[in-house]
């Protein structure tokens, strides 16, 4: 039987990206900058007492990204003479329920005594000793509004061992199965035309079964999985408490996060689409292999970062989604269909056919500096010269109602790509059939090309545009598949 889990990362939001790490007593091959994000978790070759078994499972340190090894071995009593100290500073203040450590998880070795001091500026907010008893250990102590941690490692659980830390987490991860989840639903959505960038959502109700405090914070990440398949990563947008142990939580995806910060805009000439998207979203995206970079000329007016990303994606001619990964996936929709058979399809499939599009008009823009211009970007005024590119449907009959799609606000569409962009939008709107079918989800992702049964014994082939997922141990998804 499959298993569905929701992992709530009860961590200080954005603290890992905000952290700067320094250390006394770290080995020369340690890359302490990896501590907030995590380094390699390996059984390494070393000269430690009774550590390196000749079983072929230990590997060389040089071939891996080690976050932290101490320079010094602990003594016969497991205590360090010169105690390693790790200092982590932040540019912003953060709050968390404590600090988690991943020590030598490959062998079970761990630091067995440490001290953490939390600071706000020069003020010591908390000072606490901990005695870890596992290679993964949570040092529980709630502290709010701190901007520095000083961690002192006192000793190891076995004598003559290095202190090894693969990751420091500013909080802890809590996983819940369906016994603790009263209800949960996911809506994952994309726009194959890139004329919009929808926000995908997770709404769930959690019933706490243990006497544990929670510190739900905006933008804390939540992962949803069915077995080993990642459905999506979402971020807390708000919550309500309806009983002592019952919480209703609303979450959105990375595009929802981008919608809450502004982009100042700019004017660009032959700017790499990939580098411009990186400037907007901060590198939290991947581009699939079939997508080639392109150069864009035009402007982005001041707007939210989600709106700015949409401008780039549309002019680039690609799609984006957040399902099935941590971050944004930039891709071209699949063209080789995989079949979703009747064994995974519930009864009640339907097909809706949209009205014929009689023409598409796309407005291209050219921006030149002009003191009397109508566009203001960063305090500089620009004149916007526009050109309209049209593609007309040659198969329109006398009985067809006029239905013209007009795209006027795509400010990164220049004259060089105006006609090809109009053709691309026209081609998209020739796909008029939307098949709605409820399926047993098996890892399908937005943009996948699939063939699904319809209500009259045939099939419809197209790309997945939307999935409304009701979470249980068997995951059912109401899919919308757009085809010809």
Question: Where is each model-derived feature located?
Answer:
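Short beta-strand-centered interaction patches in the first periplasmic/extracellular domains
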Residues: 1-13, 123, 142-150, 156-172, ...
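Short capping motifs at secondary-structure boundaries
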Residues: 281-286, 316-318
């Amino acid at each position: 039987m499959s298993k569905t889990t929701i992992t709530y990362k009860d961590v200080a939001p954005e603290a890992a990206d905000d952290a700067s790490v320094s250390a006394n007593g770290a080995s020369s091959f340690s890359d302490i900058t990896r501590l907030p994000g995590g380094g390699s978790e390996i059984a390494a070759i070393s000269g430690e007492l009774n550590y390196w078994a000749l079983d072929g499972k230990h590997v060389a340190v040089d071939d891996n990204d080690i976050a932290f090894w101490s320079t010094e071995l602990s003594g016969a009593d497991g205590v360090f003479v010169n105690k390693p100290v790790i200092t982590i500073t932040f540019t912003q203040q953060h709050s968390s329920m404590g600090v988690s450590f991943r020590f030598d998880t490959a062998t079970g070795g761990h630091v067995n005594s440490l001290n953490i001091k939390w600071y706000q500026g020069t003020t010591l907010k908390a000072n606490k000793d901990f005695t870890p008893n596992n290679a993964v250990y949570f040092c529980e102590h709630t502290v709010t509004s701190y901007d520095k941690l000083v961690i002192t490692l006192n000793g190891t659980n076995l004598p003559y061992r290095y202190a090894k830390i693969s990751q420091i987490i500013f909080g802890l991860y809590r996983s819940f199965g369906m016994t603790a989840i009263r209800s949960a639903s996911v809506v994952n959505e994309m726009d194959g035309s890139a004329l919009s960038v929808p926000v995908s959502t997770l709404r769930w109700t959690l019933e706490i079964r243990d006497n544990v405090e929670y510190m739900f914070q905006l933008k804390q990440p939540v992962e949803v999985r069915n077995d080993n398949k990642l459905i999506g990563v979402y971020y807390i947008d708000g919550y309500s408490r309806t009983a002592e142990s019952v919480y209703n939580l609303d979450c959105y995806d990375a595009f929802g996060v981008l919608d809450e910060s502004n982009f100042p805009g700019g004017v660009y000439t032959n700017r790499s689409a990939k580098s411009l998207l990186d400037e907007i979203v901060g590198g939290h995206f991947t581009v699939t292999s079939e997508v080639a970079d392109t150069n864009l000329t035009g402007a982005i007016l001041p707007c939210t970062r989600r709106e700015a990303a949409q401008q780039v994606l549309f002019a680039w001619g690609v799609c984006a989604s957040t399902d099935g990964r941590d971050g944004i996936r930039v891709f071209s929709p699949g063209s080789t269909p995989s079949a979703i058979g009747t064994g995974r399809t519930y009864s009640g499939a339907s097909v809706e056919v949209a009205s014929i599009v009689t023409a598409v008009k796309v407005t291209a823009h050219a921006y030149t500096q002009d003191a009397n211009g109508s566009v203001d970007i960063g305090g500089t005024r620009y004149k916007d010269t526009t050109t309209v590119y049209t593609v007309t449907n040659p198969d329109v009959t006398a009985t067809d109602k006029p239905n013209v799609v007009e795209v006027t606000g795509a400010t990164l569409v220049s004259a060089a790509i105006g006609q090809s962009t109009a053709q691309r939008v026209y081609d998209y709107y020739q796909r008029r059939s939307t098949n709605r079918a409820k399926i047993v989800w098996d890892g399908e992702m937005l943009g996948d090309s699939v063939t699904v049964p319809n209500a009259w014994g045939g099939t419809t082939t197209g790309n997945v545009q939307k999935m409304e997922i009701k979470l249980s141990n068997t995951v059912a998804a109401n899919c919308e598949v757009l085809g010809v």
